[in-house]
Amino acid sequence: MARGDNGEAARQALEELCGAYWYPLYGFARRRGLSPDDAEDAVQAFFLKLLKQDSLGRADRERGRLRSFLLGALSNFLAQRWRNESAAKRGGGAKPLRIDQTWAEERLTQEVDGSTESEDFDREWAYALIERVFGRLERFHEAKGRERVFERLKGCLLGDGSYGDEAEIAAELELSGAGVRSAVFQMRQRFRRYVEEEIRDTVGSEADLREELSHLCRVLAEHQG
């Protein structure tokens, strides 16, 4: 999906990406002091503004990473416009995003203190991306009738990559040891490919992709550490 595309394709791309990554935007607005309701309204209004002004089309390949673009754009939106708009004008009542405020507020209570707003945003962005990738992996394995394989081996994609006792897993899944190792290898390969595909949808070049991948890996490693 090319971020530089115009017209309906660009609009659909923006809708999909913002739908997937609304929580980092919501969390950022909350940390700027907005109430839960105001934060939700602000993100909805911000999204409508992006659609109205075709901002995805302007955030072309030379602009680099969509993550950085959205963070800067939302920060400016909150500072320059949001606080000056009346509640009656906030998106005109339209709510194009599906925002689960209850879930978001619960998640915010689990966040670690001591980091900056931008660090929190990047971490939440990284987690949203990983959750999106896991969803794709789960659907892929379900389509192949391999749900049990995914559920039993998905630990190989997390933390230190361990996934349990190989012999025990082989017996449980009715695979050989080599079959388990092959399944783990393929799952890791597909995981990396999906991560790169998701990132590619938010950047303008292969160089940006490599930078973004490296950055998000550091973000996750720092949080886990």
Explain the meaning of each model-derived region:
Residues 1-225:
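Intrinsic, short, N-terminal disordered tails of RNA polymerase sigma-factor systems
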